[in-house]
UniProtKB/Swiss-Prot annotation:
Keyword annotations of the record: Cytoplasm, DNA replication, DNA-binding, DNA-directed DNA polymerase, Nucleotidyltransferase, Transferase
Gene: dnaN
Taxonomic superkingdom: Bacteria
SUPFAM superfamilies xref list: DNA clamp
Species classification: Bacteria, Bacillati, Bacillota, Bacilli, Lactobacillales
Organism: Lactococcus lactis subsp. lactis (strain IL1403)
Name of the featured protein: Beta sliding clamp
Quaternary structure note: Forms a ring-shaped head-to-tail homodimer around DNA which binds and tethers DNA polymerases and other proteins to the DNA. The DNA replisome complex has a single clamp-loading complex (3 tau and 1 each of delta, delta', psi and chi subunits) which binds 3 Pol III cores (1 core on the leading strand and 2 on the lagging strand) each with a beta sliding clamp dimer. Additional proteins in the replisome are other copies of gamma, psi and chi, Ssb, DNA helicase and RNA primase.
């Protein structure tokens, strides 16, 4: 039967990571549990909600864990309650002892807490991914790609393919990440170094958001595997599995205008433009159509927003450069604010075709690697 002692902080950190995959709203009751597997070489914590699964391995020689294993086995414990109990234990070291009928005794200092466990045999078998070709990437790079795209996914479940980020390896040796909710789009291209893994998949936005909390060391390299309907992200101790969204993602390249189609090219200070949109949004949230109007006439660039109930906003913008024709176009300022949040460059380039065609945003001096697209709103 299981028996081990471990540093509470190291164990608690592993619990926190694993619990990212455990939800309360699951169709299989066993998936509200945490599975603990103890072997001579270490402890594995397993959590899953059916869509995301995490295996977190604490090796016995982990210096921070100060682990001593006296007995092996496996058990299921109520995840949320167990995490709360561990966090309240008084001493730095905790002892975990399995008793009869899967009861667990936690000892820390003068505290003893008994928990009712369950046989691990009732836990669903997690689908394994066969290790074949893989792609290695730094956590920091993956997080950047996800941040630059995931905000544009749809929240409407009636079109599932748009609730995830489309990831595709291209014949040009690049990774393409793209997301759209049909009102806006964000696309990122990243050169890859000799990747053997070829794929065309849709990764759910919920998996992406959890990924950021699971892999916290931005400088480490992780390995990516894909098999059937699953994607695996793995480092030395954590295996993070995600189900993929079924379906074919539309060709978004056709949405990006040709260079010759643009009739107006503007460059702004990104921070100034965002602050202007923030002020305009104060009024647009009070209106039914929620739009701001951008009017370009000669050297003048003006934003306006009106609310019959509240008032109006009129602000002149300074364009760092302007090439092309005059234009008046209306759009949702929320979309532009979201787009500017993920652009790190100090200056942003915005190009227009007409007042009824989508316009594009890019960091200034950026080539085709990162482009965003926003659809205007037709107003009377």
């Amino acid at each position: 039967m299981i028996k081990f002692s471990i540093n509470k902080n190291a164990f608690q950190n592993a619990l926190r990571i694993t619990k990212q995959a455990i939800g309360s709203k699951v169709t299989i009751p066993a998936l509200t549990k945490l599975k603990i597997e103890v072997e001579e070489n270490g402890i594995t914590l397993i959590g899953s909600n059916g869509q995301i699964s995490i295996k977190n391995f604490l090796p016995v020689d982990n210096k921070d864990a100060s682990m001593l294993i006296s007995g092996t086995g496996s058990v299921l414990l109520e995840a949320a309650f167990f995490e709360n109990v561990v966090s309240q234990l008084p001493e730095v070291t905790l002892e975990f002892t399995e008793k009869e009928q899967k009861q667990v005794l936690l000892t820390s200092g003068k505290s003893e807490i008994t928990l009712k466990g369950l046989d691990s045999e009732i836990y669903p078998h997690l689908q394994e991914i066969s290790e074949g070709s893989s792609l290695k990437m730094k956590v920091k790079v993956l997080k950047e790609i996800f941040t630059e795209t995931v905000f544009a996914v749809s929240t409407q479940e009636n079109r599932p393919i748009f609730t995830g980020v489309h990831l595709e390896t291209l014949s040009t040796g690049e990774l393409k990440a793209v997301a759209t909710d049909s009102h806006r789009m964000s696309q990122r291209l990243l050169p890859l170094e000799d990747s053997e893994l070829k794929f065309d998949v849709i990764l759910p936005s919920k998996s992406i958001n959890s990924f950021k909390n699971v892999f916290t060391n931005d400088e480490e390299e992780i390995e990516i595997f894909i098999s059937g309907s699953q994607m695996l992200f793995r480092n030395e101790t954590i295996s993070y599995y995600s189900r993929l969204i079924e379906g074919s993602y539309p060709d978004t390249n056709r949405l990006i205008p040709n260079e010759a189609d643009y009739t107006l090219d503007l460059v702004f200070d990104a921070a100034q433009l965002r602050h202007t949109m923030d002020r305009a949004r104060l009024l647009t949230v009070m209106t039914t159509n929620g739009t701001v109007k951008l009017t370009v006439s000669g050297d003048s660039v003006v934003t306006t927003a009106n609310s019959p109930e509240v008032g109006s906003v009129h602000e002149e913008l300074t364009a760092l450069s302007k090439e092309g024709n005059d234009l008046a176009i209306s759009f949702n300022p929320e979309y532009l604010i979201d787009a500017l949040k993920v652009i790190k460059a100090p200056e942003v380039r915005i190009r227009f075709i007409s007042n009824v065609r989508p316009f594009t945003l890019q960091p200034r001096n950026e080539e085709s690697g990162f482009v965003q697209l926003i659809t205007p709103v037709r107003t009377n």
